[in-house]
A protein has these predicted regions:
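Adenine nucleotide-associated cytosolic modules
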Residues: 1-267
Length: 267
């Protein structure tokens, strides 16, 4: 049951028939893990906190740089040289004191990630490198926790959701879409540049997909890649097909016996 204060704060969402009071309560009871507190993580975290998600866990090992301020909209000049997780947490608490924020100022690895993922209802991958994305994908798959992955560079962005908690979870994963050895073909924002509103658009979509999932909206689409060409304002959608040779989702038993695998804790 929502408190009077919560009802007033979220009444514009509560009045939506797809959300209602029960949907808002699900948001208030939810825990979301956000990996990466750059442009994607900034936008997603702001909207999730504003929407009333009860707990956000922010994970990033980086500090705010002046070059971040053109697109990482939660940060201010005074945050330069401050850990990103601390600066973002400060802004989120000011936005919504009812949202519990926990920070993890370190790079995710095989020791840290399984427990953090297992304690979450959904994971947002807002990281900026393939090594992290593949690790997050593997852990979310093995822990059966939904993953919403976003990426942006130049004038382009993409977002896709994977509901690994569903019975048919072996219908594709991030590794089916982007092989591990693909990293040499990708550029970096520091080299190729990035236009700020693109990361905002993709981060907001990650937040929207998380809200759809947490509120149990039937419109939530899984395994559907959405790509955005900001220069021409063009959207395209692609249905992901599972790779029968995928080292993650096509060989669960093999991964269990692989030293490279992870162990998802029981809570």
């Amino acid at each position: 049951m929502l408190s009077d204060n919560a009802f007033l704060r979220y009444q514009r969402q509560v009045c939506l028939p797809e959300i209602g009071e029960s949907g808002q309560q699900k948001l208030c009871d939810a825990s979301v893990l956000i990996i990466g507190c750059g442009g994607l993580g900034n936008s997603a975290a702001l909207y999730l906190a504003a929407a009333g998600v009860g707990k956000l866990v922010l994970c990033d090992d980086d500090e705010v740089e002046i070059s971040n301020l053109s697109r990482q909209i939660a940060f201010r000049n005074q945050h330069v040289s401050t850990p990103k997780v601390d600066a973002l947490a400060q802004q989120l608490r000011a936005l919504n004191p009812e949202c519990h924020i926990r920070t993890v100022q370190r790079r995710v690895d095989r020791n840290l990630l399984p427990l953090e993922v297992a304690m979450s209802d959904v994971v947002l991958d807002c990281s900026d490198n393939l090594e992290t994305r593949h690790l997050v994908n593997q852990v979310c798959f093995e822990c059966q926790i939904p993953l919403i992955s976003g990426a942006a560079i130049g004038w382009s962005g993409q977002v896709i959701a994977f509901d690994f908690s569903a019975p048919n979870k072996a219908t594709g994963c991030y590794a089916c879409m982007v092989p591990r050895d693909y990293s040499d073909q990708l550029g970096k924002c520091s080299d190729l540049g990035i236009i700020g509103p693109v990361v905002g658009t993709i981060g907001n979509l990650q937040a929207l997909l998380a809200i759809q999932y947490l509120a149990e909206l039937p419109e939530f689409k899984t395994h559907q890649l959405m790509t955005f060409d900001a220069k021409h304002l063009d959207w395209q959608k692609w249905q992901l097909m599972a790779d029968p040779d995928c080292e993650i989702c096509a060989a669960k038993e093999a991964n269990t016996n692989n030293n490279e695998g992870v162990i998802c804790p029981s809570l």
